[in-house]
Amino acid sequence: MPKTIVRHLAYLFYLGVLILPILVLDHEEALIRPFRDQLSSYIALIALNILLLEFFLSGRIRFLSRHLGLDWVLQTHQLFARVALAFLVIHPFIYSLPNHPNHSPGPATSEYLGMNGAGLISGIAALIALIAIVALALGREEAKMRYETWRFTHMLLAVIVSALGLYHVLAVGFYIQQHTLQIYYLSLGILAALSLAWTYILKPLTQSREAYAITKIENITSQQFLLTIKKLSGSLPQIQPGQYLWLKYGSSKPYPENPFSIALVNHEQKEMSLLIKVVGDFTAQLQQARIGERIYIDAAYGDFAQHALNSEKPIVMIAGGIGLAPFLSVLSKAKEIAFKNKIHFIYGNRLEDQIIDIAKLIQLADLKSLTIETIVSEPTAAYTGLCGMIDLNNIQTSLQKAQLNPKECLFFICGPSAMIDATEAALEQLAVPLAQIDAEKFQYNLAAHTPRTQATLARCIIGTLLIIAVSVWRSLS
């Protein structure tokens, strides 16, 4: 089944799960409250549902990342976190019923709200923590926050928000008094906690028994190195070209841990290599590691370029800097299966000395159909390739030199988020259908005017409007 259809079906299923609580509650009991109070309670229940489901859309469930792609999973995670925040900010102002008198507090009824004491405080605290989560996620780069610090803070705040939110709903909610909804939310909360425990407690314990050892560290350029690791016992996990892993250095404890694309795999030697750029403390420590030191991994994730070598269309790979890494595994697989289709590789860097000689890492003699075009934004006088950014003009020039019609090609893009956005915008101007473009990002600039961003926002807006429409319908019917 085509990936696009799978993603559409998955999205419909996700929306169905979101509205499930307001569909299963006892509607006869719901009709005894005013419309506004019903609507407010409904969107609050859906918001809590979103927050608990976020634990399963963090990108750490291998099945989802392999079949739906990291791009889809993280987009859904990030966008619907904002939907939940909007619902939770709005819902207190929709209520029309008064609160219980101070001299006679009590649970929510058909005539009064139950916003008193710990129930009220927990709701306010959960909302503040959720605002902090979204703010840190949006402003991490501007604040120059270390990735490991942000991940730990994000996880900790998510636990706080979910626990306080669940307590708030159980303490002051009107419809949550129904046994069916209590079971649903408590079960979902337990499953969310178990998913967290699996990722950060149980999985590290299993990783400690499946260690890897560093066998080689090769400096490829001044800021990029190839880290080769070997599994000490057993065989390598199943790895497809273009996938990535989570890596820990020195210890299997939950933190620090970082994602890296898998560049090369040698199943016979039980080795894999990662192309890494030094951008912070963690990668700098890896570059200075000693041969034989232990590495612990969680692999493999993602579906980037999974179907690149199954198509009859010409393949165009566009990499910015360290975005070369996943393409090395794709090219290695293409060589292994004697791939005959045209492959055109566009490789951009800021400086010439940052260009990696792919032929030194992969024997490309068998890939007769491969052509490589380099682009340098700050060239020296001796440089003879294309100059500037990976933009419309350079992409068009490169494709013309390779005698390729962009409308007939499949495009795979990897690199910094801004570079991916710019490349997708350029391909839109070349009339390349979005279905022929594959890119995988960890962060998203929703202000970028690209076909993918517009489609993502449209999907989220339509889904949100559908949720609101169902909530209104249930409140009125």
Predicted regions and their residues:
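Membrane-embedded alpha-helical bundles of multi-pass integral membrane proteins
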Residues: 2-197
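Reductase modules of NAD(P)H-dependent flavoproteins
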Residues: 2-13, 17-19, 97, 159, ...
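Short, conserved phosphate/pyrophosphate- and ester-handling motifs at nucleotide-, phospho-/glycolipid
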Residues: 77, 154, 242, 323, ...
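Hydrophobic alpha-helical transmembrane segments in integral membrane proteins
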Residues: 173, 177, 197-213, 256, ...
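Ferredoxin-reductase
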Residues: 206-296, 312-314, 349-351, 362, ...
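A short, basic/flexible loop-to-alpha-helix module at the beginning of a structural domain
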Residues: 300-311
